[in-house]
């Protein structure tokens, strides 16, 4: 495989290319292509019900009642290309007309269909961020029901505000071209806000706001370009529409939904990977030995904070440890399973024991190699035990003794006083 350093590219482009390949490898490891296909079929079932619920929420407020058609146009324009929007509008009208005759069971199934899409997104995003402790189902249901109700209201405010500004300024009449550009910028801004909220709130872990904003903005811009390019492709491919007529819409719609979800998922991978950009952490090879070193570094920083009666967040740890936020989260979860650290309700972490009571050998056995768990009659394990015995003898020290022998090179952690959890 050709190394990037051998390519005739400037260092900045080499770094960007290498980081992009790192994000793509993560996307492939998380099976984003297959997940995008799954979300595509889920969207086919829930797209019309989801838009219907959104329109019902908007229509419930008289101030937005006159904007319902603009609201529907905005949703269809940003979710699907024009050719599919015309078809979906027909089904949407039929569905909305029949929604008033639904029973309580029917309404519950309608809401469940919409929530199932959100729960699928929740599971996917938590997998991308390597979250091992997902939220409880009831909490998820409450969060996404809030999104279904408050999301349309925020969009309604944005659409009504932009419409009022265009009418008040007279641009819609005097400069329709400029008004169209402003509308497109408004759509891009709203899409950025929605994706930023999605990337920032859905994963059950710490996501820096700037990372969510950068990922949301780049994904929204990519979706806009992809939608324009796909629309151009559909215009060129008139042969399919001539042969298949209205049936040609559905294959194109499937392809677009697959492309849309793949873009959103890769945007999520980018957002989750941005913490690896600082210090070129993405160049490191992740292995058990590296994780052991990061876990030991984590305990060192927590022990420094313990001296001052403080707890640390993931952002504080990332400032001293060269790895990603998701990797820090996994290490903290592993240390919590060992009973060494505890997380507070505020999301801060603290060491539960004095450094004198924390064994490095136990840490080595958990993260790297534990031959004691092998069968007694395993000859290979027995031989390896003899080989690594001197190494384990050197590791059979406490965290306090390690700190005494090898004081940390970085500065001690200094933060505002925060009480340690329980």
Curated annotation (Swiss-Prot):
InterPro entries: UPF0761_bac (IPR023679), Virul_fac_BrkB (IPR017039). It comes from the Bacteria. The chain crosses the membrane at residues 44-64, 102-122, 141-161, 178-198, 212-232, 246-266. Pfam families: Virul_fac_BrkB. One of its GO terms (cellular component) is plasma membrane. It is found in: Cell inner membrane. The keyword Ribonucleoprotein does not apply. It is a multi-pass membrane protein. The keyword Membrane applies. Keywords: Cell inner membrane, Cell membrane, Membrane, Transmembrane, Transmembrane helix. PANTHER family: INNER MEMBRANE PROTEIN YHJD, UPF0761 MEMBRANE PROTEIN YIHY. Belongs to the UPF0761 family. NCBIfam families: PRK04214.1 (NF003256), yihY_not_rbn (TIGR00765). HAMAP family: UPF0761 (MF_00672). This is UPF0761 membrane protein LHK_02978. It comes from Laribacter hongkongensis (strain HLHK9).
């Amino acid at each position: 495989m050709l190394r990037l350093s051998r390519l005739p590219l400037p260092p900045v482009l080499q770094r960007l290319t290498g980081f992009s390949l790192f994000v793509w490898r993560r996307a492939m490891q998380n099976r984003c292509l297959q997940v995008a296909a799954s979300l595509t079929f889920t969207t086919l079932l829930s797209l019309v019900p989801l838009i219907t619920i959104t329109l019902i929420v908007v229509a419930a407020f008289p101030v937005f009642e006159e904007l319902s058609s603009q609201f529907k146009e905005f949703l269809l324009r940003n979710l699907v290309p024009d050719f599919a929007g015309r078809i979906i509008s027909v089904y949407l009208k039929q569905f909305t007309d029949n929604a008033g005759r639904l029973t309580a069971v029917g309404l519950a199934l309608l809401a469940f269909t919409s929530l199932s899409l959100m729960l699928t997104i929740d599971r996917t995003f938590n997998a991308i961020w390597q979250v091992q402790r997902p939220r409880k189902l009831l909490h998820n249901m409450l969060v996404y029901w809030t999104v279904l109700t408050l999301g349309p209201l925020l969009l309604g405010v944005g659409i009504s505000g932009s419409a009022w500004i265009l009418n008040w300024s007279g641009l819609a009449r005097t400069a329709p071209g400029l008004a169209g550009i402003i509308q497109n910028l408004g759509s891009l801004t709203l899409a950025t806000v929605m994706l930023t909220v999605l990337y920032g709130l859905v994963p059950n872990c710490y996501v820096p706001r700037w990372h969510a904003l950068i990922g949301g903005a780049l994904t929204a811009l990519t979706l806009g370009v992809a939608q324009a390019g796909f629309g151009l492709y559909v215009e060129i491919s008139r042969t399919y529409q001539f042969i298949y007529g209205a049936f040609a819409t559905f294959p194109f719609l499937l392809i677009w939904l697959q492309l849309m979800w793949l873009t959103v998922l890769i945007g999520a991978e980018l957002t989750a990977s941005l913490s690896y950009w600082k210090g070129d952490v993405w160049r490191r090879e992740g292995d058990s030995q590296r994780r052991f070193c990061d876990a030991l570094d984590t305990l060192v920083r927590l022990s420094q904070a313990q001296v001052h009666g403080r707890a640390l967040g993931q952002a504080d740890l990332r400032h001293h440890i060269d790895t990603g936020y998701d990797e820090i989260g996994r290490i903290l979860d592993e240390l919590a399973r060992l009973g060494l650290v505890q997380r507070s309700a505020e999301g801060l972490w603290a060491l539960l024991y004095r450094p004198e009571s924390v064994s490095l050998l136990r840490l080595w056995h958990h993260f790297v190699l534990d031959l004691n768990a092998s069968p007694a009659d395993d000859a290979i394990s027995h031989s390896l035990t003899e080989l690594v015995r001197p190494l384990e003898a050197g590791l059979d020290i406490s965290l306090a003794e390690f700190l005494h022998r090898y004081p940390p090179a970085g500065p001690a952690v200094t933060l505002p006083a925060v009480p340690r959890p329980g």
